[in-house]
Amino acid sequence: MEMNMDMDMDMELASIVSSLSALSHSNNNGGQAAAAGIVNGGAAGSQQIGGFRRSSFTTANEVDSEILLLHGSSESSPIFKKTALSVGTAPPFSTNSKKFFGNGGNYYQYRSTDTASLSSASYNNYHTHHTAANLGKNNKVNHLLGQYSASIAGPVYYNGNDNNNSGGEGFFEKFGKSLIDGTRELESQDRPDAVNTQSQFISKSVSNASLDTQNTFEQNVESDKNFNKLNRNTTNSGSLYHSSSNSGSSASLESENAHYPKRNIWNVANTPVFRPSNNPAAVGATNVALPNQQDGPANNNFPPYMNGFPPNQFHQGPHYQNFPNYLIGSPSNFISQMISVQIPANEDTEDSNGKKKKKANRPSSVSSPSSPPNNSPFPFAYPNPMMFMPPPPLSAPQQQQQQQQQQQQEDQQQQQQQENPYIYYPTPNPIPVKMPKDEKTFKKRNNKNHPANNSNNANKQANPYLENSIPTKNTSKKNASSKSNESTANNHKSHSHSHPHSQSLQQQQQTYHRSPLLEQLRNSSSDKNSNSNMSLKDIFGHSLEFCKDQHGSRFIQRELATSPASEKEVIFNEIRDDAIELSNDVFGNYVIQKFFEFGSKIQKNTLVDQFKGNMKQLSLQMYACRVIQKALEYIDSNQRIELVLELSDSVLQMIKDQNGNHVIQKAIETIPIEKLPFILSSLTGHIYHLSTHSYGCRVIQRLLEFGSSEDQESILNELKDFIPYLIQDQYGNYVIQYVLQQDQFTNKEMVDIKQEIIETVANNVVEYSKHKFASNVVEKSILYGSKNQKDLIISKILPRDKNHALNLEDDSPMILMIKDQFANYVIQKLVNVSEGEGKKLIVIAIRAYLDKLNKSNSLGNRHLASVEKLAALVENAEV
């Protein structure tokens, strides 16, 4: 054991001396001598071998020295267990391309048959027979692999030619150049197969440094597996390796190398920044390492986000240091889980002088997932995924706050531009906010920098990860002034297309293409001096167009009253199929009405046949209901009943409709009420309700007017309990007025209800006279009441005698009614209607009140039109 340790120490010293001599004598002769000693396998070879240790090339794993592979097997060599970077000469390049490149051209694939270690004899034999033949090939591979060898002491490839290498450059200069070139190549790659490109570069930098790799790789191993192994091995030892046994490691060497810091040697730009950490609990670790990838196909037959694996072939996703454990199964799953990744926290770095300097502050994490242990550090830092992820959606308060901040920034920049117009102030892109459709439309109309309103945005590209992103606002005054006209025009255009009201106005303002014949008629109608001899036969083929035109419709209406039947028939045959459409046309409905008035019986029957089955629809339309009313006037009674019967199941709906109530009224007027029993039966229990309805009160009046005595009695029996309410109702007062207008020769029930109304009015004459709607009932009571009924009402208003009339109190009924804006009309009716002593007392009371107003110089009611009218009435009245 002690002998082995002494031998190890001697070999270590020999390695250091060899490295120093190689650095001081970097000529090719020394390199060849060193290489010769290695090849011969003697003592000189063992003395020539050495390790040049650097902090960036240390390792914590067991590895075999590459050059020792030439000395013998791992079992026979005591020096084989040392882990140091080889400084010997690299082995010669093999002309058998399959050893390095395989059948597919991938030099990661090695064959197990070519992994036997080389002896000195076989090496010399190989060198003797293949040096001259492979000189050109070695030069090509030398250029392909970046002109770099892991050997410090010798040439890039031992091919027997002293001038094969450019001996003027040392190891570190070559190594640095290859690192820079490789780093640039890695950073410039943006293809999905960048993993293969990175593995190729690493292999170029360190290939042929050791033949021990051939003992560790199996035949036809997939490129992804090789790539991970290459990355893992090159980071830890600086050479390509895979440990085949853990029993041969030296515990003392592991403890000796444990304190060396681990550096990233492949990405020069990131070496002072990222330091890998094997502690899974280190949340603020700076270096992020990728794990070992699973075995899978290397032919890139699967999408890059699946790491080249077919779907549903793996169950557990890879572990990332300081990243959550997730499956990379689909882009959406990948993106959604990468949003919550861990961001490296703040960390102090150490400069070249050994002093710590503070790094820029960064958020430590987005979430706090548990990070798995780092089993295989990647040779270069994994990029921050948050740099490529779209921002998460903002909440409503955050969106409002962002909008307010954006508006404040725009206002400040506009103010700065006003102060100094020669300075350009860039404006950040505003954050798009989802909003309702109407609000978007409003924003689009009023935002001149919206893509729809600004032609300068044609060359601008929005963020593809953001929906409805808005380009940067152009704050140049010159550009704003030059594009103002276009923006205004576009704003008007978007305004017309964004509001339904604007669209309807635009449709109304559209210019219809009229026929020359219609244009001629319109021109002749506007010119009063023109004498147009056009008749119905002249518009043959244009009847429908004329019916829908204002001037054309008037022309047809005028001609139908005087034209012969033949010409009417020609026009009717053109429009008969469009009778339903024309009935609801603003101008065409008058033509259909004229055909009911002046048309033949056959023409009327044809129109009635088209109306059958459409009565409900036509009765509810604004213009068609007028056609139905005209038809009920001119068609036969049987046809009227047949048409109205279609409305039997919708009488209440028709009565409450602003158009349908006119059809019901016309039906009651033109059809005997006994033929329409369904109308009154539908209104049973709804009489008072309909009497207070704006349209129903009209139908109730028509029923009282044209109904039979039994019908009138049934209606009045429902109304007599609601007389005080109907008198003061804005629609019910019309029903009461109709009852008051009926004379005494009507049926007994009507006379009794009228007397009841007069008594109710007389008992509340002052209150009803001052009421806006009830005052109308009081006036009708005075006008249409009998002499006894009139005297009953007047007795509640007139003063007792002449002295009382000259000295009326302010709270007397006469004075209260004169002052009121509604009741003074009742007083005017009393002056015109009253006779004899009653009229004399009324005139005296009015004059006394007017004299009192003049003496008191009161301006309260002096100049009211009603008071002046009263003064004019009593001035000429004879007392």
Swiss-Prot record:
Which terms in the GO cellular component ontology are assigned? cytoplasm; cytoplasmic side of mitochondrial outer membrane
Please name the InterPro entries in this protein's record. Answer: ARM-like (IPR011989), ARM-type_fold (IPR016024), PUM-HD (IPR033133), Pumilio_RNA-bd (IPR033712), Pumilio_RNA-bd_rpt (IPR001313)
> According to its UniProt record, where is this protein located?
Mitochondrion outer membrane; Cytoplasm
Q: Where is this region: Disordered?
A: 222-256, 344-417, 443-512
Q: Specify the domain of life of the species encoding this protein.
A: Eukaryota
Q: Does the keyword Membrane apply?
A: yes
Q: Topology in the membrane?
A: Peripheral membrane protein
Where along the chain is composition biased (Low complexity)?
Answer: 237-255, 398-417, 449-463, 472-491, 501-512
Name listed for the protein in its UniProt record:
mRNA-binding protein PUF3
- What is this protein's gene name? PUF3
